[in-house]
């Protein structure tokens, strides 16, 4: 068997064994995708024992390409919500996530200096303790750039493997300890969250308003500023028994009923000016109008503003809501259309058909992957990651690397959505498949490279000490941030658990947090809020630590 065929066969064996190990669960907790690392260690141990030689260049390429695939698909997935998560609504949660990363870095620095742990080992332990595989890849690359010997860089995988199991279990232990220490009642926390979130959430609502203001009589809809703002959409007008879609030139009369869509505070502003809220149905049932949901798939309209389509004037159709990546937005005239946007339409059946053809509404396109944008994004990411940043006093130029470069590019492209006919939308199933493939390839190679000396290090070397260091890097930041969040800002416990899981970019911990109260969405919401920024910081932090430790 050729070296290439043997290498591919061994990687397949590692993946099968590792995924099988990852599916093992003890009290509902398993290693998940991390099992691939241990599958690689087992196979790597026997490969060295029986002197099986694999193609080193091929292993190196597969490891790096797997990492690129993983971080790029992560960036495309979280890109649309990354920048919005930094706004005021998630500012507090993201501040705690930043604090956790900083405390983890400080603990790592103290252990490195206090116990004289070699730099490659402590960075590997750090990556495993926070269960973040891209951090390991980023740390390996920056150490290689700094000139660290390859045999030392390869030891990082062992440090990662030693710390990883407690990284998975430690966060669950901390959640339990916080619950015990503060004597938390889960049902009470869930009710408190539902009450608070129900009052503050920025979901779109509807309101039927009767025109009572005599100053509006005889004015057209376009002459009333509040009815043309980006915060409220007037989707229907009822006059007597006639229900219509209001055009910009439609004249308002006293006694008209308007159906408005927007956030509650914006609707209240319109009500104060227009008249009073009334309990009158403006349903399209039994009328010439109907409602429909269509998907934007036509490349010709991507990036265009809703006003540019002139749907009201041409087709007497109004867009009442815009759903983007599961988030409902006001369909303001200035909103740009992106691939995969779901539009709620109101109009006559034949007009809705015409509008559907304009925006695309081709469901099958949502299941197709445009490969050209994928490789453009990957190429740009690698180029960005290769750009050297020279800092006076540093022994080597800083780079975003193969982990940071593709991530930053993917975040930006995911936020932009499309450029001309190129769109970076990726079906969730395709994104997940590429992401899982990438991480399996990366972990398989890391495990194979680490397996030869793993058992000896654990039994006869410093393996147990590394496990202890990892436990400190896992536990101290989690306990510090968890206690501060609960004591200082009285953070809801379910929200706190989701924030801790998101800060560790740990899906098994999210599953555990969701299981605390299955009907509450508190944990999932806070996890999604902090995950994008936390993932970015987790990838960048070992590179910063590596450069700082190297120079000190």
Curated annotation (Swiss-Prot):
Gene Ontology biological-process annotations = potassium ion transport
Q: Which UniProt keywords apply?
A: Cell membrane, Membrane, Repeat, Transmembrane, Transmembrane helix, Transport
Q: One Pfam family, short name please?
A: TrkA_C
- Name one molecular function that GO assigns to this entry: monoatomic cation transmembrane transporter activity
Query: Which superkingdom is the protein from?
Result: Bacteria
Signal sequence extent: none
Q: Does the keyword Transmembrane apply?
A: yes
| A cellular component annotation (GO) from this entry | plasma membrane
Where does it localize?
Cell membrane
Q: How does it sit in the membrane?
A: Multi-pass membrane protein
* Start and end residues of each RCK C-terminal domain: 192-276, 279-361
Q: Which residues cross the membrane?
A: 1-21, 26-46, 65-85, 96-116, 119-139, 158-178, 371-391, 393-413, 439-459, 464-484, 493-513, 530-550
Q: What InterPro entries does this protein's entry cite?
A: AAE_transporter (IPR050144), RCK_C (IPR006037), RCK_C_sf (IPR036721), Transpt_YidE_put (IPR023018), YidE_YbjL (IPR006512)
Asked if Membrane is a keyword of the record, the answer is: yes
Q: Report the family membership.
A: Belongs to the AAE transporter (TC 2.A.81) family. YidE subfamily.
Database matches in HAMAP family: YidE (MF_01016)
Which NCBIfam families does the record cross-reference, listed alphabetically? PRK03818.1, YidE_YbjL_dupl
Name this polypeptide is given: Putative transport protein YpsIP31758_4141
**The species this protein was found in:** Yersinia pseudotuberculosis serotype O:1b (strain IP 31758)
Write the lineage as a comma-separated list. Answer: Bacteria, Pseudomonadati, Pseudomonadota, Gammaproteobacteria, Enterobacterales
């Amino acid at each position: 068997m050729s070296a290439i065929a043997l290498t591919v066969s061994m990687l397949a064996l590692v993946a099968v064994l590792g995924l099988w190990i990852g599916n093992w669960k003890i009290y509902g907790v398993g290693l998940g995708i991390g099992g691939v690392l241990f599958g690689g260690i087992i196979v790597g141990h026997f490969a060295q024992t029986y002197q099986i030689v694999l193609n080193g260049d091929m292993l190196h390429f597969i490891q790096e390409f797997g990492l690129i695939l993983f971080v790029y698909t992560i960036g495309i997935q979280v890109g649309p919500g990354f920048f919005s998560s930094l706004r005021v609504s998630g500012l507090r949660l993201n501040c705690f996530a930043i604090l956790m990363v900083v405390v983890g870095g400080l603990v790592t620095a103290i252990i490195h200096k206090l116990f004289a742990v070699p730099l490659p080992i402590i960075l590997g332990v750090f990556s495993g303790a926070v269960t973040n595989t891209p951090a390991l890849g980023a740390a390996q690359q920056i150490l290689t750039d700094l000139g660290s010997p390859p045999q030392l860089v390869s030891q990082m995988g062992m440090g990662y493997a030693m710390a990883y199991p407690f990284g998975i279990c430690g966060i669950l232990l901390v959640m339990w300890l916080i619950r015990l220490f503060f004597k938390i009642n889960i049902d009470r926390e869930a009710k408190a969250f539902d009450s608070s979130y129900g009052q503050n959430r920025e979901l779109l609502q509807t309101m039927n308003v009767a025109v009572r203001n005599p100053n509006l009589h005889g004015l057209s809809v376009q002459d009333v500023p509040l009815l043309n703002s980006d915060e409220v959409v007037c989707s229907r007008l009822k006059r007597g028994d006639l229900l219509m879609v209001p055009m910009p030139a439609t004249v308002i009369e006293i006694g008209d009923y308007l159906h408005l869509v927007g956030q509650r505070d914006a609707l209240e502003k319109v009500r104060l000016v227009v008249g009073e809220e009334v309990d009158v149905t403006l349903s399209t049932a039994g009328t010439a109008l109907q409602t429909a949901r269509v998907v934007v798939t036509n490349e010709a309209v991507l990036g265009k503003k809703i006003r540019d389509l002139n749907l009201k004037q041409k087709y007497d159709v109004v867009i009442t809501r815009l759903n983007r990546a599961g988030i409902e937005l006001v369909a303001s005239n200035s909103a740009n259309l992106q691939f995969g946007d779901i539009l709620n339409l109101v109009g006559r059946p034949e007009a809705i058909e015409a509008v559907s053809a304009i925006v695309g509404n081709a469901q099958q396109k949502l299941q197709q992957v445009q490969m050209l944008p994928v490789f453009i994004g990957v190429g740009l990411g690698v180029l960005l990651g290769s750009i050297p940043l020279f800092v006076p006093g540093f022994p080597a130029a800083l780079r975003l690397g193969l982990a940071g470069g593709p991530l930053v590019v993917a975040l930006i492209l995911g936020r932009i959505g499309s450029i001309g006919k190129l769109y970076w939308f990726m079906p969730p199933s395709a994104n997940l498949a590429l992401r899982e493939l990438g991480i399996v390839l990366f972990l398989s190679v890391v495990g194979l490279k680490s397996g030869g000396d793993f058992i000896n290090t654990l039994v006869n070397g410093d393996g147990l000490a590394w496990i202890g260091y990892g436990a400190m890097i896992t536990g101290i930041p989690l306990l510090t941030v968890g206690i501060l969040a609960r004591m200082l800002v009285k953070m809801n416990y379910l929200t706190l658990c989701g924030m801790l899981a998101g800060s560790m970019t740990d899906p098994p911990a999210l599953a555990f947090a969701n299981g605390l109260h299955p009907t509450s969405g508190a944990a999932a919401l806070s996890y999604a809020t902090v995950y994008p920024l936390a993932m970015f910081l987790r990838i960048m932090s070992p590179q910063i630590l590596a450069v700082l430790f190297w120079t000190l």
